[in-house]
Amino acid sequence: MSSYLFTSESVSEGHPDKIADQISDAVLDAILAQDKRARVACETMVKTGVAIVAGEVTTSAWIDLEALTRKVILDIGYNSSDVGFDGETCGVLNLIGKQSPDINQGVDRKNPEQQGAGDQGLMFGYATNETDSYMPAAIHLSHRLVEQQAKIRKKKNSALSWLRPDAKSQVTLRYEDGVATAIDAVVLSTHHDPGVKQKDLIEAVREEILKPVLPAKWLHKGTKFHINPTGKFVIGGPVGDCGLTGRKIIVDTYGGWARHGGGAFSGKDPSKVDRSAAYAARYVAKNVVAAGLADRCEVQVSYAIGVAEPTSISVTTFGTGKIADELIEKLIRKHFDLRPFGIIQMLDLIHPMYQQTASYGHFGRKPKDFTYTDGTGAQHSATSFSWEKTDRAEALRAAAKLK
């Protein structure tokens, strides 16, 4: 019997890097709501008293970037100098310019289906049947812990009103013969008001954050809990650390369980395959697993800038495939259009739905229908997290001729 430990971590919406991600995606959403043909590459940096928003944008839309940035910061919970960062009074510096026409000529085409990739690169998608979300269990639980911290913090008349926005989680699982069997260790560090006793904080976090999230069947006498292990976390957020867009790419994806091509997601419109192709690869892998073709599946795609067709598609099922990996690859090529325009159409990506992806993971979330108003006042309907649908699983299973 093989036995090993595996660890993943997550961070809350109030973590400095996640503040930056959310601002970048809020800018993207505001532009896409007005201009579906926009090209956006938005980067943000936050530090004590200032948010710097930079990047390259080509659009006919106009947005109030300063007001938008302040709203994101305030909605997260940074609304007072006592907390260390205040969306009302912080400086907002706009350094956004235009996208290079050299990139535009490689991406835009008279025939939309021949739209080229916005850059070269390689992207991975992954899925596993060890959780209902088809995500590795360690990252799934890590996300839910910091999500619960935010939920309790924002709850009206919360008994834990002393919680502040910044938080981190980490979960270590024990695996026996490739199956998760127990939680070996949990780390939860949460930003808090001064004067909170460590004993009271530990008890409250156990009852209100850990207990509702962690599966009782995986907890045992030997499970180690590290709650604010330094004993104090009063200085947090952008005062404690500088935050940058795109610096939590493992948190955003599979917690280290699957490989990563290196490209970040937030602030990038769907013409950037760093984002759209990673979403498509997840969609493909999840449908392969949901179809029962494998227990685990990792899909890699790669692109050349200005070229529509992927330069490669490869599949590995880690020995769990019910048919050969080569046959799964052929099915993928037949059932999924992985050209940039094909991905955008397949997943219906040109909608303002990205800010909600910028915290608690881009994957393993439930698709959600929503409506929004564009720049002309017209109403539109869309589905966020469309890459989490398993609507092609049945066709894949039938094509594979599995009983």
From Swiss-Prot:
What gene does this protein come from?
Answer: metK
Q: Which InterPro entries match?
A: ADOMET_SYNTHASE_CS, S-AdoMet_synt_C, S-AdoMet_synt_central, S-AdoMet_synt_N, S-AdoMet_synthetase, S-AdoMet_synthetase_sfam
Q: Which GO terms describe its biological process?
A: one-carbon metabolic process; S-adenosylmethionine biosynthetic process
GO CC terms for this protein?
Answer: cytosol
| MF terms (GO), sorted A to Z | ATP binding; magnesium ion binding; methionine adenosyltransferase activity
Where found, per UniProt?
A: Cytoplasm
Q: Which Pfam families match?
A: S-AdoMet_synt_C, S-AdoMet_synt_M, S-AdoMet_synt_N
Q: Does the keyword Nucleotide-binding apply?
A: yes
**Free-text cofactor note:** Binds 2 divalent ions per subunit.
The annotated pathway is: Amino-acid biosynthesis; S-adenosyl-L-methionine biosynthesis; S-adenosyl-L-methionine from L-methionine: step 1/1
**Protein known as:** S-adenosylmethionine synthase
Show the Gene3D superfamilies listed in the entry: 3.30.300.10
Keyword flag Amino-acid biosynthesis: no
Q: HAMAP family of this UniProt entry?
A: S_AdoMet_synth1
Q: Which residues bind Mg(2+)?
A: 17
Q: Which CDD domains match?
A: S-AdoMet_synt
